[in-house]
């Protein structure tokens, strides 16, 4: 019978296709012998051994196809405790084991960022989580670093500077690095075997293959109460969950890059999967970051210069990661995120995630289609903008800054026009008569002081990309921002003013020709 509120005009809801279950008669599609234990796609049933080989091959192939990590380099593994990053750490751990067919040739370390203060966790819950994190990291044997997000309030302004590095570049350079690494290993083995000729076999084996855990692990203590209060005040002042998630991601990246530079890491691995990158691509399009998709979703991200972010898990889906972690008992830690228990329409990130996952349920090729589209994006600056190594970059995300004039028909032009129309009149904040007309220097000093008070927000806003400008609108005051952001903004503004003053005294090419 009829029910209140029932919509009869809409189309019938389409039920998702049933998940195929492997039968006893079905065999593995790879070896055609073993009994299948998982079904990745429709008809692709794998046994335990073949699924592990398939999973490991994806990870190794991604590193081999993009030869960004050179032998002997120090690589920092960004571990959040979740399934994807835990699986990434497990892949590196197995790739460095003695019985591995082709051992990985880089030196790993692990970093965990405690974001409990931004997510509203109590101190007791954070201490329990950190204790569990340390227990898992100690079992890996890698050097590990546990840092709190509150440490962003003690970062130097140099974090926001893109330090240039020499291009490692060609295939010949990679082969030469491999040869040097193998020669160093052979020389080290010969020295160890010669020095330990009279030692026991166990001691010689221990010196020949030293444990990664013997390096000192950087463990940060708990932050001060003032830093925790400052971080809580910063995130509580932001109006929307979308801006909170974007700022959290930005601060986390700045902290990880700083730790990598301090400890000599030149690469940072993140555990972003194919599913997560597909959601990120659509989310960034909605946030106005379409010009930076190649950096935000590509295999490597070189925006920080000397520290390169790489994504070796970008060929794995969340389904594959979940199956692998369950079958091989990969340890992980559950930590509530900033959007935990948030409704579907609370932020653009949550809305886009629900949209993509719902489409994936009805159309299983949704994630792969979006992901393959991101692979075709090329890291090229937009024509007519200064996006080279010496060009300006965004103060927060550090991507190339698109600079348009106020009268251009772009989003930047609309924002600039809106800012100019909403600015209060100069007479409202200044006296009717010149307050210091005794000398030119005094008048200039007074004018600069008034401009400093009135345009502090505009000084930072003009150094942001379009997406970061939109997010900063949800922050009523810029005072809660970390000091290194404000200091770098002031330094860039002063450099710009000095550069404009110097340009008045320089002779251009046109003037020289005339």
UniProtKB/Swiss-Prot annotation:
What are the protein's UniProt keywords? Acetylation, Cytoplasm, Phosphoprotein, tRNA processing
- Can the keyword Phosphoprotein be found in this entry's annotation? yes
Q: Does the keyword S-adenosyl-L-methionine apply?
A: no
Q: Name one GO molecular function term.
A: nucleotidyltransferase activity
Q: Where is the composition biased (Basic and acidic residues)?
A: 12-23, 206-215
User: Mainly localized where?
Assistant: cytoplasm
Q: In which pathway does it act?
A: tRNA modification; 5-methoxycarbonylmethyl-2-thiouridine-tRNA biosynthesis
- Tell me the residues on which N-acetylcysteine occurs: 2
Recorded hits in InterPro entries, A to Z, give:
CTU2, Rossmann-like_a/b/a_fold
Residues with the modification Phosphoserine, per the entry, are 421, 425
Q: Where is region (Disordered) located?
A: 1-23, 192-222
Q: Where in the cell is it found?
A: Cytoplasm
GO-annotated cellular components: cytosol; protein-containing complex
Q: Tell me one GO biological process term.
A: protein urmylation
Summarizing the function annotation, the protein's role is: Plays a central role in 2-thiolation of mcm(5)S(2)U at tRNA wobble positions of tRNA(Lys), tRNA(Glu) and tRNA(Gln). May act by forming a heterodimer with CTU1/ATPBD3 that ligates sulfur from thiocarboxylated URM1 onto the uridine of tRNAs at wobble position.
Q: Which PANTHER family match?
A: CYTOPLASMIC TRNA 2-THIOLATION PROTEIN 2
The family classification in the record reads:
Belongs to the CTU2/NCS2 family.
> Subunit info?
Component of a complex at least composed of URM1, CTU2/NCS2 and CTU1/ATPBD3.
Q: What is this protein called?
A: Cytoplasmic tRNA 2-thiolation protein 2
- Species in which this protein is naturally found: Mus musculus
